[in-house]
């Protein structure tokens, strides 16, 4: 069995792929330590069996990924079409890296970053991805703290971090190695050309910068990368390196990361802890635009990105939304502290797209795997923006989506609500249902307005869930078009609507993203426990809601019947009892039949005394034997002699069981004396007398 870490460490010798070797320092344990798992796998057979078992899923994922990668267009064609910017400096330097990165494991890989090479490894083995991403995650975070030397302002203190944007040190390592020769003004451009093979349209990159403000208010100083491969909410944080996230959009799901508190930067550690539940800023990278209220001129390294995005931000807003089909990037309230959301939980299983009742903004970078889709989707979006704008205004302004959209199952919506760290606000209608408590529309996105002349950040709100019995209530409630949404997400409901319709035609762009999402049903392995628990509760709640409550049952059935019929029932019972009692004999009859005794207790006692007296008299007046002989009642023969004898007690002095040996000897002695002297025996038979031994 090949050690996963060996393949992961192959590119470490290259300048662009040296993520694993460069960062094996104090804060991040070296990648070499994973080699012990290979020896363990050779000895411990269940380990080997476990990895073989997961290879089936890996094969399926590989086939899907290769099919999707085959749809990509080569870098040259994208440069010709103007999708990618061509930078001669980067081309010269990246030529050496392309030879290693482009054919990693037979897959075309984004050239611009070492991160893009290791996600491709993740495509090859799901288990390997967990190990590779952890060192990368640590190395990327270390870049944020140590690799920021090219720019003097790149590393603000952790306490000042919320006020300053993330700077180019966050970009992929391959470009950070080159950044030392490239002036700060061209960092954004160099990064975008480095990641050129990821095939992102200019519309996607500019739209990504629109969302960078949102990302920064969420991520704080350092968008800490976490290992979940597909979820890239903060990836678009940089306008021009949004393309570096190609592989993660197709990676198999990875279990939550090992805690990355080893990082030297405390805020990085805090953010990595916040991310480790599954949503990954998988490729948070180069320069983020400045925070609210900070002019772009304050940080020279960000000027190119800021100026580039401000021009086309308004034009490309509508094209951004077609790429919003990934886990939710929630915009916390405008407080500048970075660790506002405690975590970004993993995306829910089976419906990672934009589920009903939730709006999720996710980087365009997600879809660099099929780069040709970006222009097609953007063209479709330009044609379809009218209807989506109306839908988006309604859906963001209203606390619920129009009821014509089929609702997703409650347990999936609960998971998506758990995924978002939005504060729970009390429901508008005042009901205390769990779904309305969990899912409430938040107006905090209105606070998150941007500067630099750009439009507001993309608002992401969690809509109220509807359990089946609430659809009727919502139909009765008038739907008020409260147009409070920003114009940054005009086409967002279009993606939602397309997903809700679940049209499977390959001609529509977002449907291919749905294929990617379907590939990620593997995420159920990590969230199955929560999903099953919520699903069980949801099913039970639905069943119980269909049953009438006890008060209703009592009011509907039993009391109404009893009021009218209880008297009749009582009469029937009474008549039956009366009829049975009437058949009983009267007291006189019972007395005559000696069944019922007379009630007079004195008479009864007198009768008893009379009976006793008669019996006593009869016994006391018994005649003697002489009287009976005289009255001829007793007749004896002549030879019978009647003698008077005194009464004696035949009982012994003590019971025979209590006789001692001395008592027995005395009895024998007395008996012998009687037989020898007192007992009259015929002389001829005297010798037959038997005596007891003394």
Curated annotation (Swiss-Prot):
InterPro entries linked: RPEL_repeat (IPR004018)
Ranges of biased composition (kind: Low complexity): 184-209, 231-249
Segments of this protein annotated with the region Disordered: 1-354, 375-405, 467-562, 589-608
Ranges for the RPEL repeats: 63-88, 575-600, 613-638
Classification via SMART domains: RPEL
Pfam families named among the record's database cross-references: RPEL
Biased composition (Basic residues): 45-54
Signal peptide extent: none
BP GO terms, sorted: actin cytoskeleton organization; closure of optic fissure; enteric nervous system development; negative regulation of integrin-mediated signaling pathway; neural crest cell migration; neural tube closure; positive regulation of catalytic activity; regulation of cell cycle
Top-rank lineage group of the source organism: Eukaryota
Location of Phosphoserine modifications: 116, 118, 129, 145, 264, 285, 335, 337, 420, 436, 446, 457, 503, 505, 549, 582, 620
Subunit structure: Binds PPP1CA and actin.
Entry's family note: Belongs to the phosphatase and actin regulator family.
Described function: Regulator of protein phosphatase 1 (PP1) required for neural tube and optic fissure closure, and enteric neural crest cell (ENCCs) migration during development. Acts as an activator of PP1 by interacting with PPP1CA and preventing phosphorylation of PPP1CA at 'Thr-320'. During neural tube closure, localizes to the ventral neural tube and activates PP1, leading to down-regulate cell proliferation within cranial neural tissue and the neural retina.
Protein name: Phosphatase and actin regulator 4
Organism: Mus musculus (Mouse)
Chain's gene name: Phactr4
């Amino acid at each position: 069995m090949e050690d996963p870490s060996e393949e992961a460490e192959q590119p470490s010798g290259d300048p662009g792929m040296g993520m694993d070797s460069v960062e094996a320092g104090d804060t991040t344990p070296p990648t070499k330590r994973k080699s012990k798992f290979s020896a363990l796998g050779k000895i411990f057979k269940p380990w080997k069996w476990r990895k073989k078992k997961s290879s089936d899923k890996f094969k399926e994922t590989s086939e899907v990924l290769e099919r999707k990668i085959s749809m990509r267009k080569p870098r040259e064609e994208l440069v010709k079409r103007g999708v990618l910017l061509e930078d001669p400096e980067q081309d010269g330097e990246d030529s050496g890296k392309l030879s290693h990165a482009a054919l990693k494991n037979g897959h075309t890989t984004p050239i611009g970053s070492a991160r893009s090479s290791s996600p491709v490894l993740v495509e090859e083995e799901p288990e390997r991805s967990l190990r590779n991403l952890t060192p990368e995650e640590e190395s990327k975070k270390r870049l944020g703290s140590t690799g920021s030397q090219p720019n003097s302002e790149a590393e603000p203190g952790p306490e000042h971090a919320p006020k300053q944007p993330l700077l180019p040190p966050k970009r992929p390592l391959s470009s950070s190695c080159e950044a030392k020769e490239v002036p700060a003004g061209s960092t954004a451009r160099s990064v975008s050309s480095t990641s050129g093979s990821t095939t992102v349209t200019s519309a996607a990159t500019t739209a990504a910068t629109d969302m960078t403000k949102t990302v920064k208010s969420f991520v704080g100083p350092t968008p800490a990368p976490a290992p979940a491969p597909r979820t890239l909410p903060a990836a678009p944080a940089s306008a021009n390196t949004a393309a570096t996230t190609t592989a993660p959009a197709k990676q198999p799901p990875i279990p939550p990361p090992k805690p990355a508190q080893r990082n030297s930067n405390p805020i990085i550690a805090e953010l990595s802890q916040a991310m480790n539940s599954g949503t990954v800023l998988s490729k948070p990278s180069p320069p983020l635009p400045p925070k609210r209220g900070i002019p772009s001129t304050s940080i020279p390294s960000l000027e190119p990105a800021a100026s580039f995005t401000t021009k086309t931000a308004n034009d490309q807003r509508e094209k951004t939304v077609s790429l919003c089909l990934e886990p939710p990037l929630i915009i916390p309230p405008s407080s500048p502290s970075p660790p506002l959301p405690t975590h970004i939980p993993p995306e829910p299983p089976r419906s990672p797209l934009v589920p009903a009742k939730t709006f999720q903004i996710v980087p365009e970078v997600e879809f660099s795997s099929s780069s040709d889709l970006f222009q097609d989707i953007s063209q479709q979006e330009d044609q379809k923006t009218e209807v989506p704008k109306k839908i988006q205004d309604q859906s963001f302004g209203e606390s619920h989506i129009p009821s014509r959209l089929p609702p997703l199952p409650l347990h999936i919506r609960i998971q998506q609500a758990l995924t978002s760290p939005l504060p729970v606000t009390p429901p508008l209608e005042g009901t205390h249902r769990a779904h309305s408590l969990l899912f409430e529309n938040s107006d905090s996105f209105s606070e998150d307005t941007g500067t630099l002349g750009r439009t507001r950040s993309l608002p992401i709100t969690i809509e109220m869930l509807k359990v089946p019995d609430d659809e009727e209530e919502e139909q009765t409630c008038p739907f008020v078009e409260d147009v409070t949404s920003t114009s940054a997400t005009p086409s967002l409901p279009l993606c939602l609507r397309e997903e809700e319709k679940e049209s499977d035609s390959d001609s529509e762009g977002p449907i291919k993203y749905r294929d990617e999402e379907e590939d990620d049903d593997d995420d159920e392995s990590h969230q199955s426990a929560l999903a099953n628990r919520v699903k069980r509760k949801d099913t039970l709640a639905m069943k119980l809601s269909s049953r009438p409550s006890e008060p209703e049952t009592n009011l509907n059935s039993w009391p109404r019947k009893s009021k009218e019929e209880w008297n009749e029932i009582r009469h029937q019972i009474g008549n039956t009892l009366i009829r049975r009692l009437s058949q009983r004999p009267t007291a006189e009859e019972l007395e005559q039949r000696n069944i019922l005794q007379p009630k007079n207790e004195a008479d009864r006692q007198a009768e008893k005394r009379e009976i006793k007296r008669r019996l006593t008299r009869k016994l006391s007046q018994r005649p003697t034997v002489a009287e009976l002989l005289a009255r001829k009642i007793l007749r004896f023969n002549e030879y019978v002699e009647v003698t008077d004898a005194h009464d004696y007690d035949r009982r012994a002095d003590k019971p025979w069981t209590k006789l001692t040996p001395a008592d027995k000897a005395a009895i024998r002695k007395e008996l012998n004396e009687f037989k020898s002297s007192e007992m009259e025996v015929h002389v001829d038979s005297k010798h037959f007398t038997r005596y007891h031994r003394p």
